[in-house]
């Protein structure tokens, strides 16, 4: 189980496919995941767009507003590509989470491996906690980024 029972989370989904059913299915899956692990879902948002741009990312902006206003303690996504496929954008979002002391929780990937594969592990360090069930899942408190 995750280490953050009864903590406030925001769920974010991005879907490049124009079929809204895919985004809603992903959103409902994450809501079920959050409920099953005792998270308190304080908000959800999603975008139908490419993961390589910030254009038309109203859902991402809404999530970041919740983070910056202290309304959540964690952001729940399937994987890092939900945030962005562009490393520059991803690092910027991770920095905002870090500055606000917000956890990033992924449900469909090994976050540590994903950060290493994307070359971003040097930006976020190695403070990962393995969940105790199913396939490897991680939640991470992002440490200071010393350089870009």
Where do the PLM segments sit?
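Short, structured surface patches at the beginning of a domain
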Residues: 1-148
């Amino acid at each position: 189980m995750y280490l953050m029972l009864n903590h406030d989370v925001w769920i974010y989904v991005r879907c490049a496919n124009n079929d809204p059913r895919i985004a809603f299915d992903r959103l409902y899956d994450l809501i079920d995941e959050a409920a099953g692990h005792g998270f308190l879902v304080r908000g959800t948002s999603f975008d139908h767009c490419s993961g390589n741009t910030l254009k038309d990312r109203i859902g991402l902006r809404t999530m970041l507003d919740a983070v910056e206003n202290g309304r959540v303690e964690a952001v729940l996504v399937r994987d890092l590509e939900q945030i962005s496929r562009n490393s520059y954008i991803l690092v910027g979002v991770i920095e905002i989470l870090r500055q606000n002391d917000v956890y990033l929780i992924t449900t469909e990937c090994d976050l540590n491996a994903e950060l290493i594969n994307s070359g971003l592990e040097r930006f976020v360090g190695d403070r990962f906690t393995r969940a105790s069930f199913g396939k490897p899942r991680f939640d991470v408190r992002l440490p200071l980024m010393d350089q870009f």
